[in-house]
Curated annotation (Swiss-Prot):
This is Large ribosomal subunit protein uL10. It comes from the Archaea. One of its GO terms (biological process) is cytoplasmic translation. Part of the 50S ribosomal subunit. Forms part of the ribosomal stalk which helps the ribosome interact with GTP-bound translation factors. Forms a heptameric L10(L12)2(L12)2(L12)2 complex, where L10 forms an elongated spine to which the L12 dimers bind in a sequential fashion. It comes from Methanothermococcus thermolithotrophicus. Keywords: Ribonucleoprotein, Ribosomal protein, RNA-binding, rRNA-binding.
């Protein structure tokens, strides 16, 4: 905390800046630190336009940001918040927002854009120059291409690149000469934007490795977990708001099956029990001789046989119709070949 004794040793503008940062930190629901050292002015303005209305971005010196964080932690009695200062690095800036840390990380990643690589920078990936016309007229640029190992020649009045060429592998330092050539060719191998250093919410500090998730995989895991929990609840007969309907349906089906199997007559099972008994009666009748059957039972048995034959014939006719319907499109398809 800046005391009255030490204030005269600190530039007034620094005291004012720390106070502004403290006010921002105290009012922020979610507080995050980002690194913006490598972001060019043009891309920074584009990022500001993209995030406007969803978050507040405040740039300042690292030392002042650190002081503001620690003073807010002391004034609010929140030692966990002070740990956020440990993540200050490079060209740090403060972001405050009401987005949860996961959405904040995703938003910042989506706001990034491709940019030319600078001389002396490390290639983030293999940088490849594709074969084809550069669209540039013959001139000194032809020599520049060759000087960095790119096979080039004049083709149809324009400078053309003869073949694909990897000019820098991932991890290699890009020379200033190569960086100029790549920029002239419009090759932008670098992605620039605000890199999240850490985000603070309700006593927890989130780092990028935690916030970077595969959304589709994450949703699938949640769905799988829900499905397993649902099945466990149903099989263990644990009623919940989500499973009560399924449990009642299962209980009803089980009770109905027991009632039918044990021939216990109820309003819901009488028809099924009588139907089952009738079928069993006919099955027994078929096994005994005609002499043991009365006329009424013989008539019922013959009627059942006729109905069964009719059902079989109807099924055969339906099968024939299905085959005809399947054959018609095939014949039409063959007709198109001739």
């Amino acid at each position: 905390m800046i005391t009255a004794e030490s204030e005269h040793k600190i530039a007034p503008w620094k005291i004012e800046e720390v106070n502004k940062l403290k006010e921002l930190l105290k009012n922020g629901q979610i507080v995050a630190l980002v690194d913006m050292m490598e972001v060019p002015a043009r891309q920074l303005q584009e990022i500001r336009d993209k995030i406007r209305g969803t978050m507040t971005l405040k740039m300042s010196r690292n030392t002042l940001i650190e002081r503001a964080i620690k003073e807010v932690a002391e004034e609010t009695g929140n030692p966990e918040f002070a740990k956020l200062a440990d993540y200050i690095d490079k060209g740090a800036a403060i972001i405050t927002t009401d987005m949860n840390p996961f959405k904040l990380y995703k938003t910042l990643e989506e706001s990034k854009s491709p940019a030319p690589i600078k001389g002396g920078a490390v290639a983030p990936c293999d940088i490849e120059v594709k074969a084809g016309s550069t669209g540039m007229p013959p001139g000194p640029f032809l020599g520049e291409l060759k000087s960095v190992g790119i096979p080039a020649a004049i083709e149809k009045g324009k400078i053309g690149i003869k073949e694909d060429k990897v000019v820098a592998k991932a991890g290699e330092v890009v020379s200033h000469k190569l960086a100029v050539v790549l920029s002239a060719l419009g090759i932008k191998p670098v992605t620039v934007g605000l890199n999240l250093l850490a985000a603070y919410e309700d006593g927890v500090i989130y780092t990028p490795d935690v916030l970077k998730i595969d959304e589709e995989e994450f949703v699938q895991k949640i769905q799988d977990a829900y499905s397993k929990a649902f099945n466990l609840s149903v099989n263990a007969a644990i009623p919940t708001a989500q499973t009560i309907e399924t449990l009642l349906q299962k209980a009803f089906a089980n009770a109905r099956a027991v009632s039918i199997e044990s021939a216990f007559l109820t309003e819901k099972t009488t028809d099924d029990i009588l139907g089952k008994a009738y079928s069993q009666m006919l099955a027994v009748a078929r096994e005994v001789g005609d002499d043991a059957l009365d006329d009424e039972l013989k008539e019922k048995l013959s009627t059942a046989v006729v109905e069964t034959k009719a059902e079989v014939e109807e099924a055969k006719e339906e099968e024939k119709e299905e085959k005809k319907e399947e054959a018609a499109p095939a014949a039409a398809g063959l007709g198109l070949l001739f």
